[in-house]
């Protein structure tokens, strides 16, 4: 008989536990005691309480402070359970995710205790002795407040350093449930992933690890399969004449792979292995000649192959069956020492990938609410931003298969953190055992996904240990380093050696080098946001930037829907509550001030300028780093998404609305990026050094090729000898240059560079060649006619290549003598009838035009962010969710704003 799985979705209830020994929050509201509520499973108790009207939405206004009692209380989920084996030998209770500290019982008889949100559990119900009929038993999952479990562990481990006054390091639970510098505190409990009954006989497929490689054009799938045999039947359960133990049977494993070949055919290949009674599994290898390869987006197709794994008797009866998709590709990360330090080069199918990534946080603080449709919407947005890598950050969870399947389909590479973030973690029991179990479980579970290329030991823990002086508080107590340097890499190597493991982010490749060193592997650039202006991103060229970001509030409608302050200002209570970063409002103001001046108390002005500053700051970093390839091989912006309406570093807010940053990232992450930057003296070439010993493998380290920057407007000099430091060539030299990064192809085109005054009048113009014989960076030296301005407050430099544009402002915007923007706006219905096409035609220089249809209609969206137009130019905006009745509002402030208007209003106020 084939394994039968019955998911337990219906018939659940949840209630507060009040037995005298359990925890009940002191501020428990009326109406909660003694109430039994219908429960959603998979789910968490917050949603059930909210649905029943017993809990206000924690994300609305300042309700967060009124909902903390939920996480401080104990909760019990119950339902009736049928444990009839129905002819099978085994009946297992399978819990794919329990959040977090739970006692399970059947008719009051204990089953097990759990204490880890991040792993799966399976319980043999034959071991639970109960009486009475098999179809009316009560299953109870009683969840204890995570705070009390954390308190018990903390009492044994002692106080350990961390960023917040919350005990998340002491319990294996989503850390950001306890709040973060972008997140509210909502400590959840509940069966957050499916609960099921599985009935089976003889044996089942216990674990499947499909590890792929490519050898001489042939796809190779090594499927590591572990079996569990049923064992003897207990307690006299009747199963007829079945073989009751399965221990003496030979079994057969069959693996079938079908999918595309390089020439467009569909192929099917099959292999099998016989498993004797003394064996608990086998490795079944399937070779697929001429298999089409899986590539990251932008580098090729995402060829996926269907895999079917069957466990059969020798007579061919199917006992268990699994199916999934995988992709054939080789993948790794090169970190061998070169002339500039240690690179961090993500390599897929032998090609170094120009990584343009986004950091992912949990998309909801009630993480069970995130379904496949939500994942798809967010990941589609990442694709639309032209990202090719998503880093799953270590304060969240290992996401569901839906997330990784969608990344597989979209060609989004995945960097997966183990869930350790920004704190010291105890290494003694019971946490150590839980870490081992969860790591083994998830490394195996996710091994089928071709998108997954990096496992990372932790987020910032080693770096913060050094810079924040944790050693003084810790003394000689272990604090997690053993996990990152020993335990986790050992598990990855044993369970899935096909994946690259990095110790931390940031990490320099060696304990002897400062973890966040710009010349070695991964770097987090947070000093800029926290302390200085964004032009300091240009101070260095890290090898790989795995975190950096700049804050802005959510889209206007999202902010207005979440906060009801009247009047609403940047400093009104609700707006401030929806800002969780330390000194966050002051840092926003500090970012605006040097470039735009003070935003004052006007919310419209503040909202516009913070959005513009976020986009400009991120552009400064990305342009600088990407145009210094191959010294820098990747940029991963913090962050893609949000889990509640908040001022944060996100490009997409919690309602799914795109900030202007999202549209700017489309430009910055394009395969071809045009930037105007200060003249750079950085030697971007990296040269191989004599073969060294790779300290991770003990063998020879791979060599890294030199990829020099092409100088197309100069005399063809080589990096490091370009004459830029020659005083005889410095007179009247342009302080800026055009840099063009082409990630996928060579180039043979021109860039049009104009120096214009603020009315839009052309003062000088040059057309300069841009030629690359392969992917790389072209640096275009500017003649003084266009690169040197006569009036720093009254001129700008504009570079155009095809449809791509870069603008250089010689002085801060606050000092520029911007003139009133003059333009004409016309509307027409979209061909699909779902909105309007807005065409704006400029009669003057129009700087940073922003259209915000969500200020007119809740469903309003726009396909562009900030735009700069020269006289005579036109731009088309596609607006959805609005209609002809909205036209007047769409062409009026504040739905349509330009920089000159915003700054002029502030000057008028200051002069009044």
Regions of interest found by a model, annotated:
Residues 1-389, 541, 627-628, 632, ...:
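Secreted/periplasmic carbohydrate-active enzymes, especially glycoside hydrolases
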Residues 356-358, 390-392, 414-416, 544-546, ...:
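Hydrophobic faces of well-ordered beta-strands that scaffold small-molecule active sites
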Residues 353, 385-389, 408-413, 448-453, ...:
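Loop/turn elements at helix/coil->beta-strand transitions in domains of secreted/extracellular proteins
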Residues 338-344, 400-402, 437-445:
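Alpha-helical scaffolding within the catalytic cores
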Residues 181, 296, 359-371, 387-396, ...:
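The substrate-binding groove and active-site-proximal loops of carbohydrate-active enzymes
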Residues 16, 190, 455, 502-515, ...:
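Substrate-binding clefts and catalytic carboxylate motifs of secreted carbohydrate-active enzymes
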Residues 389-433, 515-523, 528-531:
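Aromatic-lined substrate-binding rim segments of carbohydrate-active enzymes
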Residues 428-510:
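Active-site neighborhood of glycoside hydrolase catalytic domains
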